[in-house]
Amino acid sequence: MEAYIYRTLDVEEESFAALLEGANGPLQHLRFSEGPGVSLEQVTAWTRLASTSSGELETARIFEVIDQIRKQADMVPDAMVVLLTRTPHAGHWFSLGEGNSHYMHADDWNLFTATSFRLPVTYMLASNIIMRGMYDSMEELTCRAHQQPRGCLLDLSWPMASYPLSCLGMPFPL
C-alpha cells in the first residue's frame, strides 16, 4: 500500500526526508512518498486559506484541502493521501483521518517527547494507515474496540467475558 504525503513549507525538507526514510525502513508492506502533482507552495497556500483567524485548521477544512489535493493531483479515490503540516488542528488533535484522507500535525511534539517530530509522526502514520486497513471509520473502530470485543487483542484465546477485571484495565472488582 502506498501513501502519498503532501507537506506544507513549514515542514523542513531535511526533517521530511528523514521521516520518509524512517517510515519506509521497517514497514515493508507500507510505502510512503512525497505526493505528486501539487507543488509545496500550492499545498501551503490552500492550508493557509483553510486556517481560521487564529491559525488553526477545523476538521472539515482539513478534508477540503485534501480534496483539493486529490483533484489537482488527479488521484484515484482509493489513494491514501496525508496532509503533513505544522498548522495545528483547532481541536488539538495530532492526527486524524477518515477513509483514505489523513492529517498529521508536525509541531508541538516536543511538549510530550524529547525526540523530534519524526518518530511520533512515523508512528502515527503507520498506526492510522494500518487502522484504516482494519476499520472503515472511527465509528467502526469504536464499536469493535469497546462495544463488541471478542477477546484480548494480545491473546484471542479467551472470550472477553471470562477475563479477570484486572486484565481489562480495572484494578478493582465491580
Model segments located where?
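Structural motif
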Residues: I5-E12, V82-T87, D107-D108
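Short glycine-rich, low-complexity/disordered patches
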Residues: F32-L40, V81, M134-A145
